Structure formats: structure tokens, C-alpha cells
């Protein structure tokens, strides 16, 4: 599933194409994704201008001049691709034919086309009054953004205090911190030297103090690399992300630990149905 860096990469790719532009046609090619699409979605989108493109956790939020916001979640296999919209004087390329899993297609007044493709249909879209966006069921219970000012040592120390769930599970709890996923929690815990098996409430304040900036750095590096492409994820121009080439533990089971002088190999354990990758020697 695309995590925060992948969704932020997509948002940044869409921003210059969508922000300030008007949707002249919305082609809704099926009535549902993971859940039914919003009623009258076509008429609620057509003719509307996108004022702002934001991200909350793993959701893209397109604020419309109608007073509504389009909420987009990529799910497991969703991708958003941009076609057309060449600069003035550039050679014109015909828009490619739509594919089987192109479920929502937005054409803009610039000639650009934005296509939501989702083979497994675990993605989601909804429309919500912008003034009520924070109360939307998909967003209402989310914790602070890990790259925002509300996520800091004191906050995380308080949220982890007394918790007997593993630190890995605590960081994946979207009520604790929004947008973190399996890949980047594994990578951050490795860099912080914290075992994913350690009880969250038994991580010292000193180690939490180092974990918070490490989480920020890992996410920032992943965004800079365009995210991680393991299966379906693509950037908006169709290119792969590149952060998977920089994994230190994730998806490296039985590979030598990258820490100089460490004789151990990366191990994999299953926690709450998800694979955790770590080095038993470097992470305690």
C-alpha cells in the first residue's frame, strides 16, 4: 500500500497540473471502488476549479471552488497518472487510450488529463464539505502528521507511555501518528537501533528523542527519491520510485546487515499480520 512518501510524491506531481485549473469533464467509469463513489460525482466535479491540493496522512485532498473537497485514497494498487497538457509550442501527443482499470478520468481546461487507475479497487474517493473535512470518517481520528510540528518527542513519549503493544504496532496506529506504514517504520526503527518487538512503553525517553528526527529523515529521504516501488506504485509520470534501492532492512530477509562489522543478517518476523524486518544484533 502506498505510504506517506508515495502519496506526497503523487500530490507534488499533481499540484502544478491541477491547482488553479478547471475540470471540464469528469468520466466516472464505474459506480464504486472499495466503497460506492459519491452520489452525482460527475456533476459535482465538472466545471469546478481546484483551489488547493493538500495531503492528510495517506489521503490527497483537492479543495474545489464549490465549497467541497475531493478526498482520494490510493488503496493497495491505486495510481494516478497525468497525460497531455503540453506547454504552448510543444509537440502535441494524442492522449493514450483508456485502460480497463482506469476508473475515474478528469479532463482539465489546459488539455491535461488525470487518470485514477486501480486494478484491485481498494482505493476510495469521496466528496465532503470543505468546512467539515476534519470530521470526515476517514480523517477524524488521525493522529498528527509525522512531518508536522505537533509530532515531537514530548507527544510521542506521552502516547507510548504504558503501552504494552510492540513499538512497531504503536507507530503503525494511525491514531498515534498519521501516514506511517510498514516500510518506513521498519527503516526508522533500524536506524534508531530499536527492535520492533520491544514494548512501546519500555522505549526510553532518550531513544524516543532520537526516533522522532529519524522518522522525519527517513520520510524526507523517501519523498526526495519519489517513494518506493515494490509492486503497483508509480509516480504521476509513470516512473518508478527509487527509495527501494536504499532499503537497509525492509524486504532484505537473510541479507547481511549493512552496519559495518555486524556479523548478523536481517531477520523477518510477522507482527499483526505484517512482516517486520530487523537486525537482532543492532536493534534492541
Swiss-Prot record:
<dbReference type="InterPro" id="IPR012319">
    <property type="entry name" value="FPG_cat"/>
</dbReference>
<dbReference type="GO" id="GO:0008270">
    <property type="term" value="F:zinc ion binding"/>
</dbReference>
<feature type="active site" description="Proton donor; for beta-elimination activity">
    <location>
        <position position="58"/>
    </location>
</feature>
<protein>
    <recommendedName>
        <fullName>Formamidopyrimidine-DNA glycosylase</fullName>
        <ecNumber>3.2.2.23</ecNumber>
        <ecNumber>4.2.99.18</ecNumber>
    </recommendedName>
</protein>
<keyword id="KW-0238">DNA-binding</keyword>
<feature type="zinc finger region" description="FPG-type">
    <location>
        <begin position="248"/>
        <end position="284"/>
    </location>
</feature>
<keyword id="KW-0227">DNA damage</keyword>
<keyword id="KW-0479">Metal-binding</keyword>
<feature type="binding site">
    <location>
        <position position="163"/>
    </location>
    <ligand>
        <name>DNA</name>
    </ligand>
</feature>
<dbReference type="InterPro" id="IPR020629">
    <property type="entry name" value="Formamido-pyr_DNA_Glyclase"/>
</dbReference>
<feature type="binding site">
    <location>
        <position position="120"/>
    </location>
    <ligand>
        <name>DNA</name>
    </ligand>
</feature>
<comment type="similarity">
    <text>Belongs to the FPG family.</text>
</comment>
<keyword id="KW-0456">Lyase</keyword>
<keyword id="KW-0378">Hydrolase</keyword>
<keyword id="KW-0862">Zinc</keyword>
<dbReference type="InterPro" id="IPR035937">
    <property type="entry name" value="MutM-like_N-ter"/>
</dbReference>
<feature type="active site" description="Schiff-base intermediate with DNA">
    <location>
        <position position="2"/>
    </location>
</feature>
<feature type="active site" description="Proton donor; for delta-elimination activity">
    <location>
        <position position="274"/>
    </location>
</feature>
<dbReference type="InterPro" id="IPR010979">
    <property type="entry name" value="Ribosomal_uS13-like_H2TH"/>
</dbReference>
<dbReference type="Pfam" id="PF01149">
    <property type="entry name" value="Fapy_DNA_glyco"/>
</dbReference>
<feature type="binding site">
    <location>
        <position position="101"/>
    </location>
    <ligand>
        <name>DNA</name>
    </ligand>
</feature>
<dbReference type="Pfam" id="PF06831">
    <property type="entry name" value="H2TH"/>
</dbReference>
<keyword id="KW-0511">Multifunctional enzyme</keyword>
<keyword id="KW-0863">Zinc-finger</keyword>
<dbReference type="InterPro" id="IPR015886">
    <property type="entry name" value="DNA_glyclase/AP_lyase_DNA-bd"/>
</dbReference>
<comment type="function">
    <text>Involved in base excision repair of DNA damaged by oxidation or by mutagenic agents. Acts as a DNA glycosylase that recognizes and removes damaged bases. Has a preference for oxidized purines, such as 7,8-dihydro-8-oxoguanine (8-oxoG). Has AP (apurinic/apyrimidinic) lyase activity and introduces nicks in the DNA strand. Cleaves the DNA backbone by beta-delta elimination to generate a single-strand break at the site of the removed base with both 3'- and 5'-phosphates.</text>
</comment>
<dbReference type="InterPro" id="IPR000214">
    <property type="entry name" value="Znf_DNA_glyclase/AP_lyase"/>
</dbReference>
<keyword id="KW-0326">Glycosidase</keyword>
<dbReference type="GO" id="GO:0140078">
    <property type="term" value="F:class I DNA-(apurinic or apyrimidinic site) endonuclease activity"/>
</dbReference>
<comment type="subunit">
    <text>Monomer.</text>
</comment>
<dbReference type="GO" id="GO:0034039">
    <property type="term" value="F:8-oxo-7,8-dihydroguanine DNA N-glycosylase activity"/>
</dbReference>
<dbReference type="GO" id="GO:0003684">
    <property type="term" value="F:damaged DNA binding"/>
</dbReference>
<keyword id="KW-0234">DNA repair</keyword>
<feature type="active site" description="Proton donor">
    <location>
        <position position="3"/>
    </location>
</feature>
<dbReference type="GO" id="GO:0006284">
    <property type="term" value="P:base-excision repair"/>
</dbReference>
Amino acid at each position: 500500500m502506498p505510504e506517506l512518501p508515495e502519496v506526497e510524491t503523487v500530490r507534488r506531481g499533481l499540484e502544478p497540473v491541477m491547482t488553479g485549473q478547471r475540470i471540464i469533464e469528469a468520466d466516472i467509469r464505474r459506480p464504486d471502488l472499495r466503497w460506492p463513489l459519491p452520489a452525482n460525482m460527475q456533476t459535482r466535479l465538472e466545471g469546478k476549479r481546484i483551489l488547493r491540493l493538500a495531503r492528510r496522512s495517506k489521503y490527497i485532498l483537492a479543495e474545489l471552488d464549490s465549497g467541497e473537497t475531493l478526498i482520494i485514497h490510493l488503496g493497495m494498487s491505486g495510481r494516478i497518472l497525468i497525460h497531455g497538457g503540453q506547454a504552448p509550442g510543444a509537440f502535441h501527443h494524442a492522449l493514450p487510450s483508456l485502460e480497463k482499470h482506469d476508473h475515474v478520468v478528469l479532463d482539465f481546461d489546459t488539455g491535461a488529463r488525470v487518470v485514477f487507475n486501480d486494478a484491485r479497487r481498494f482505493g476510495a474517493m469521496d466528496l465532503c464539505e470543505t468546512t467539515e473535512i476534519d470530521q470526515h470518517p476517514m480523517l477524524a481520528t488521525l493522529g498528527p502528521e509525522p512531518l508536522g510540528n505537533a509530532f515531537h518527542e514530548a507527544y510521542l513519549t506521552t502516547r507510548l507511555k504504558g503501552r504494552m503493544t510492540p513499538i512497531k504496532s504503536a507507530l503503525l496506529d494511525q491514531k498515534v501518528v498519521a501516514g506511517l506504514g510498514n516500510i518506513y517504520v521498519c527503516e526508522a526503527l533500524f536506524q534508531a537501533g530499536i527492535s520492533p518487538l520491544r514494548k512501546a512503553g519500555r522505549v526510553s525517553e532518550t531513544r524516543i528523542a532520537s526516533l522522532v528526527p529519524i522518522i522525519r529523515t527517513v520520510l524526507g529521504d523517501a519523498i526526495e527519491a519519489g517513494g518506493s516501488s515494490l509492486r503497483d506504485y508509480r509516480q504521476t509520470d509513470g516512473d518508478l520510485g527509487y527509495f527501494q534501492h536504499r532499503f537497509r532492512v525492509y524486504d532484505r530477509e537473510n541479507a547481511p546487515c549493512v552496519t559495518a562489522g555486524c556479523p548478523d543478517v536481517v531477520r523477518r518476523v510477522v507482527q499483526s499480520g505484517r512482516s517486520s524486518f530487523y537486525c537482532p544484533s543492532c536493534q534492541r
